[in-house]
């Protein structure tokens, strides 16, 4: 729930964040087109919302989906760190 609240503050309460902003903020290493290809191929498990059925329609990510994706990535990182036998306690929020 904390991630969702942080995102709500970051995006001024927008329900759907434009894909270019999500790409700029969280996928800086990718272009918007490359991010779309990764989503369509299943490499990135992030639902893309289209405002209409048209291919040219505005695309975005629902804020709850982005929060869930970020939380899943954080959990995967914690799991990987634990498997590597990292020293120290892993903090969870």
What are these regions (language model features)?
Residues 3-34, 69-72:
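Polyanion-binding surface elements
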Residues 66-79:
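C-terminal structural segments of small proteins and small subunits
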Residues 18-19, 47, 62-65:
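Helix N-cap / beta->alpha transition motif
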Residues 10, 55, 72-73, 83:
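Residue-identity detector for glutamine
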Residues 2, 25-60, 81, 85-90:
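Major-groove DNA-recognition helix of helix-turn-helix-type DNA-binding domains
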């Amino acid at each position: 729930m904390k991630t969702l609240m942080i995102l709500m503050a970051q995006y001024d309460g927008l329900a759907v964040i434009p894909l270019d902003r999500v790409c700029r903020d969280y996928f800086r290493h990718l272009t918007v087109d490359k991010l779309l290809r990764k989503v369509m191929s299943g490499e990135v498990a992030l639902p893309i919302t289209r405002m209409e059925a048209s291919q040219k329609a505005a695309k975005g990510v629902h804020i709850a989906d982005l929060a869930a994706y970020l939380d899943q990535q954080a959990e995967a990182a914690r799991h990987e760190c634990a498997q590597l036998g990292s020293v120290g306690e892993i903090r969870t929020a």
